[in-house]
């Protein structure tokens, strides 16, 4: 499993609520559960499926996925279709809209050493859309939050994308989307 940033987007709900927790968690050994490993496989498949839907070369990772099954394929196909639908909506106003998959973002202007990898970023002349794929089925994840006004993980990704691309695209709208197919979200 890859090393996470000290103040990672995926743990932002925790370190925003309890800043000392970041230091405590950093001292713990990072071990991945079978659920996390399954999620990693699902993300690998999704990235491949979106790349293929975009007409890009992408080696099929299925043989190397430990947790691959028909449900993972079905969920990944749905995700790829969803991303393409969102892209088509943006292309109605901007034919040059782009999709970035597994894009590194840097939000360190706001959070020390703040970096992460966004599952999917859609860019158009005035709209930024962040799509986060959640394969888990234990916890329903929302794109909004009464406490923070938005999902903290997606907000970190959005800040990083704005920092990198706003000079080119001049965003007026930022959309944050959770795609969680096994919980119909």
Regions found by a protein language model. Give the residues of each.
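Metal-dependent nuclease catalytic cores that hydrolyze phosphodiester bonds in DNA/RNA
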Residues: 1-127, 175
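Mg2+/Mn2+-dependent nuclease catalytic core
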Residues: 37, 95-185
